[in-house]
Design a protein with these regions (language model features):
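Surface-exposed patches in mature extracellular/periplasmic domains of secreted proteins
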Residues: 8-14, 38-40
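Contiguous mixed-secondary-structure segments that line small-molecule binding/active-site clefts
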Residues: 21-22, 26-29, 34-35, 39-136
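Acidic helix-start/capping segments at beta-turn-to-alpha-helix junctions
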Residues: 11-24
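Signal peptide-proximal N-terminal region
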Residues: 1-9
Length: 136
């Protein structure tokens, strides 16, 4: 449609080629697949700055604010340098909206987070919740 047939896309779902979501970046980097469409937050082990190119839980009021981040002077250059260091290029963001934080018990205030167990990607938000007493 957009390429006049010169570009062919074959989609693979649910880690069917590469294994875990965190491994997709490496698979694209090494040529096993041609493209990665996972969250940059999975790559915080390589460089903590990937957190800001990905999911910043609670960092924005709406997805458009994250898009606006790249318009800030120097931001696109910083993101390009981050990805280029690993032989990759960010060609666009897929931002589905706010991440939800759901619980089987009420969390009315910050002290209620103590000993709260939940699944979270590694990086900034896990460190923040840990500092508040949670167990990500």
């Amino acid at each position: 449609m957009f390429s006049g047939g010169s570009l062919k896309v074959e989609m693979f779902y649910s880690s069917s080629v590469t294994g875990k979501s965190a491994e997709v970046f490496n698979s694209a980097q090494t040529g096993i697949i041609d493209c990665d469409m996972t969250g940059a937050g999975y790559q915080t082990g390589k460089n903590a700055a990937f957190q800001f190119a990905g999911d910043v839980m609670g960092g924005y009021d709406n997805p458009y604010q994250q898009y606006d981040f790249l318009k800030f002077p120097g931001a696109q250059d910083a993101v390009d340098a981050l990805y280029n260091k690993y032989g990759m290029t960010l060609i666009g963001w897929w931002i589905p909206g706010h991440e939800s934080l759901i619980s089987s018990k009420p969390i009315p205030d910050v002290p209620s987070i103590k000993d709260f167990k939940f699944r979270s990607p590694p990086g900034m938000e896990s460190m923040i919740f840990s500092a508040l007493g949670a167990k990500p």
